[in-house]
Structure formats: structure tokens, C-alpha cells
Amino acid sequence: MNTNKKELIPTVRQLMELHVNALFTHDQSMRLRAINEPWPGEAEAPRFFLGRTTEGTALCRFRHDVPEQLVEQLEGLCSDERIAADIEAKPKHLEDYMNLLQGERFTMGPCFLIPAYAAPTMQVVGLNRETIADYVLGDLQWLEEEIDYVQPCVALVLDGAVVSVCRSVRITSEAHEAGLETVERFRGNGYAQEVVAGWAMAVRQAGCLPLYSTSWDNHASRSVAGKLALSFYGSNFTIY
């Protein structure tokens, strides 16, 4: 990708569409099928997804087994949602969604675009099947099993050991979602934002947009977003 070329920034509505398309696989009717994990296996998608943008638009998707009559009811409620100005604000019709779907639980959180100017200030390294053997994984030993599926993968290394890593955990041809892990005893040192910035650069070099989302009660993850001044475009909400 030509990094000197001016980036065409999608609208917040387009970003939300890229986000939901990265999170889940869809059938031809754009109904949700499964969680779009890059590694083998297929976890079932939620019954309902609602994306509320900072411009006041709402995007909703439904799992393939939600009856059409119920879909119509839910779509009517979605069209009446508020602007997602507050990261922690719950959907206006949360109780109605839960009751209509007989939901067992819901998830909710902010969604960000990592801007093109984000860049690491410390040295980070790319990890793949060939290079991962050069480093001690320690508490991140599980990374060896998934390394082939989560490219690009960027790490911060101290004394030969990987202490923080950001990799692609949801992938489409247009956008990647970040998956961030830092060894507990190394948290609070700014390493997380370094690997996120390095990962975002690698994703852009592959011709895709780097997206970052988390849950509203994950204060550590939200802190990373704040320190990197990520671009908040909306909030997601799912019901299982």
C-alpha cells in the first residue's frame, strides 16, 4: 500500500458495517451465522447485533434463526435509537430487545478506528511461524498454536521474552480487528499501545483498515484507546 497516498476515511456508518462484517460470518441474506474467528472451529453468532454510530445511525443484524416477524419488530426499535455519544450509554430499547429475544446475556462496548498517524515509539517486532521460535513466550505460550491464523502479529520483547502482543483476531479483505494481550506483570508500562500502533501499521500496509473494539467495563483496554487517541465511531451491542 502506498503510504504517501491520502487515505479515504470511511463514514462512521461504513466503519460500523466493516466492524460487524469482521466480527461475524453472514449468509446471502446478511443474517449472522458464526463468530468470524480466524482459527479452526465455529462459535455461534449472537442472535442480535446493534451498532449505534456517533452520527445517530443504527445498524442491526440478526442471526439466521430469528423469525422474520420478530426481525421486523426489532428493526422498528433500532430505527428509534439515539446517537452513541456516550461510550457507556445503553441502547434506548435494551429491555425490549432482551424481552423480545428472551436474551440470556448481552455485551456492549465502544468501537474505534486506529488512525493512520498512530506509530510505535518503542521497538516492536513482527511475529510469524518463522520468527516466533526466536523468542520466549512464557505466559503467552498459546500464541504458538494460533500464530498462523492471526497475521499480522506484532510484539514487544524484553530480554528475549514477548511481554505484549497485538494480532488480527477478526479478518476480512477490508478490515482487521485487534486482539491485545499483555503479560500481567508488565501491564501499566505503555507496552500495549506500542504493539497496537505497530499492528495497525502492518494492517494498513496489507491494504486494510485497523479496527479496535472492547467492552465498556474493560477500563484497561479503553485506557489504551485513550492514550492512542483512537477515533471513536460508535458502540456495539449484542444479545445471546
Model features per residue range: what roles?
Residues 212-223, 238-240:
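Conserved beta-strand-loop-alpha-helix junction that forms the acyl-donor binding cleft
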Residues 92-96, 100-105, 141-142, 149-151, ...:
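FIC/Doc superfamily catalytic core
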Residues 121-154:
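Internal catalytic-core helix/loop-beta-alpha segment
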Residues 178, 188-202, 223-227:
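Conserved acetyl-CoA-binding loop-helix of GNAT-fold acetyltransferases
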